[in-house]
Structures are given as structure tokens and as C-alpha cells.
Curated annotation (Swiss-Prot):
This is Uncharacterized fimbrial-like protein YfcP. Its main location: other. It is found in: Fimbrium. The gene is yfcP. PANTHER family: FIMBRIAL SUBUNIT ELFA-RELATED, MINOR FIMBRIAL SUBUNIT. InterPro entries: Adhesion_dom_fimbrial (IPR000259), Adhesion_dom_fimbrial_sf (IPR036937), Adhesion_dom_sf (IPR008966), Bact_Fimbrial_Adh_Pro (IPR050263). Residues 1-27 form the signal peptide. Belongs to the fimbrial protein family.
Length: 179
């Protein structure tokens, strides 16, 4: 037998052993773990009309916004019914929409709005702001039965900008994650 043939055969054998050992090292038992929580039933969202909630701001004067910088708070209530779950379960609500480019965390007015110079803020009733597009959202404790998820919204004047009077609309998506 040729010496170079024996050497190359030895290299192939050595490479095969290394490959076999490396695949054995990565094939350890129980190296992937799954966990979760199954609820018997989450809550049903109450939809009135075509929206989950419709918020009408009262008429706000430009002068009030220019002086105070923001409007009074208006309630935003999401209604959940038939909630069933273990003691201490919660719902995390995240709010997504077009974020105001000048006021991070605030909802931008729709481009069809004639009013300008403001964004819409959202907060929990304890005053903690819930920023638009923040994946942390806001967490609420649930009880079995019916629950109201309470937020408040307000108009926030943009710093250094004039407020233009007119009508406005804006929309966002509320996502509910039961945890």
C-alpha cells in the first residue's frame, strides 16, 4: 500500500471520528424546554357598533391648549365579559398605531385631519402614560366575570408649534394578551 494513501485514509478516519464526536456533543437529551399556561377560557371583548371603543373629545379651545399644553382627560373603557381564569391572572394591553413624529409615545392625528399641532396621549387611571407602540403595554388584574379596562386619553400640544383649529381623527389597535 502506498504511504500517501495510508496517510490520506488516516485523515479521513480522523475527520470521521471528529464529526461523530461533535454530533454526539450537540445531541444532548432535554436541551430544549417548552412551557406555557392554558386558560380554560379568556375573556370576550364587548364590541359596540364597529369599534371596540369610540372616544369623543369634548370641544377644546386652541387657547386652552396653548395655555395648559394639554386638554382634560377623557375616559377610554374596554369592556371584557365572561372572564374565567385562575386567581391572579392578568391582561396586558398594548396600543399600536401611527406614532407622532414630534412626540414619541403619542398617537399621531390621521393625515385627513384639519386640526394640527397636537397628538393624543394615553394613560392608565393612575396617571402612568402608556406609550403608543411600546411592547411593554399596560397590565391589568382580572377577576372572573366582567371587567372594565380603564384608560384616559388627552390632547397634547406640540412644543413650539401653533395649534391649528379643525376636526381630527386618529386610530389605534389595542391588543390583549392574557398572562
Amino acid at each position: 500500500m502506498n504511504k500517501s494513501m495510508i496517510q490520506s485514509g488516516g485523515y479521513v478516519l480522523l475527520a470521521g471520528l471528529i464529526l461523530a464526536m461533535s454530533s454526539t456533543l450537540f445531541a444532548a437529551d432535554n436541551n430544549l424546554h417548552f412551557s406555557g399556561n392554558l386558560l380554560s377560557k379568556s375573556c370576550a371583548l364587548v364590541v359596540d357598533g364597529q369599534y371596540l371603543a369610540e372616544v369623543r373629545f369634548p370641544t377644546v379651545s386652541r387657547q386652552d391648549l396653548n395655555v395648559a399644553g394639554q386638554s382634560a382627560r377623557v375616559p377610554v373603557v374596554f369592556k371584557l365579559k365572561d372572564c374565567k381564569g385562575p386567581a391572579g391572572y392578568n391582561v396586558k394591553v398594548t396600543l399600536t398605531g401611527v406614532e407622532d413624529s414630534e412626540q414619541p409615545g403619542f398617537l399621531a392625528l390621521d393625515t385627513s385631519s384639519t386640526a394640527q399641532g397636537v397628538g393624543i396621549g394615553m394613560e392608565k387611571t393612575d396617571g402612568m402614560q402608556v406609550a403608543i407602540n411600546n411592547t411593554n403595554g399596560a397590565t391589568f388584574a382580572l377577576t372572573n366575570g366582567n371587567n372594565d379596562i380603564n384608560f384616559r386619553a388627552w390632547l397634547q400640544a406640540k412644543s413650539g408649534r401653533d395649534v391649528t383649529i379643525g376636526e381630527f381623527t386618529a386610530s389605534l389597535t389595542a391588543t390583549f394578551e392574557y398572562i
